[in-house]
A protein has these predicted regions:
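Short conserved active-site loop signatures built around small residues
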Residues: 1-28
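Conserved N-terminal alpha-helix of the aminotransferase class I/II PLP-enzyme fold
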Residues: 32, 37-86, 111-119
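Short helix-loop-beta connector
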Residues: 72-76, 96-99, 152
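Short acidic loop-to-helix transition motifs that present clustered carboxylates
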Residues: 85-88, 130-135, 141-143
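A glycine-rich helix N-cap at a beta->alpha junction
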Residues: 118-130
Length: 165
């Protein structure tokens, strides 16, 4: 993004060319994509060739978004997810393995707590910082409370900016 300012980079930074001369990213609403041969599609599914197979895996609209986020953050790559829970699941499953633990605040979104419960069969444990009582809520969010729970097995320290007291 060095050659553009932030706003110009948003519009033109990836220098993508769009089909039929579109000036902005087209929104691809197709669930599947046509290929010249079954062998061609097989190479895409086997990650031996770049391309699109099924929109839940990736599509040109999402790919364009990921390229722009990467450019704006001066990163090496990005992954767009359909929801916050999908993003958390993706991050956790890429960081954690059996025997690891998460140190977490108590006042979390219910979906996050359910995700943590779903990780238990994979040998991943969660330690909550304090009991989930209103009077404990303020104390649980102090850094010292988290530090006291961290062990050699801790791979993630997790809190949400808007918790559920």
């Amino acid at each position: 993004m060095n050659e553009y300012g932030f706003n110009t980079g948003l519009l033109h930074g990836t220098n993508e060319k769009y089909p039929q001369g579109a000036t902005q990213v087209p929104i691809y609403q197709s669930s599947a994509f046509r290929h010249d041969s079954a062998e061609d599609l097989e190479k895409i599914f086997d990650n031996k060739k770049m391309g699109f197979s099924y929109t839940r895996i990736n599509n040109p609209t999402v790919e364009s978004f990921e390229k722009r986020v990467t450019m704006l953050e001066d990163g090496i790559g990005s992954v767009a997810c359909a929801s916050g829970m999908a993003a958390l699941t993706n991050a956790f499953l890429n960081i954690l393995q059996a025997g690891d633990e998460i140190v977490a605040a108590c006042g979390l979104y219910g979906g996050t707590v359910e995700l943590f419960d779903d990780l238990k069969p994979f040998g991943i444990s969660v330690k909550y910082v304090k009991e989930n009582k209103p009077e404990a809520f303020e104390a649980e969010n102090k850094p010292e409370a988290f530090e006291a729970e961290i062990t050699e097995k801790t791979r993630i320290v997790f809190a949400e900016t808007i918790g559920n007291p």
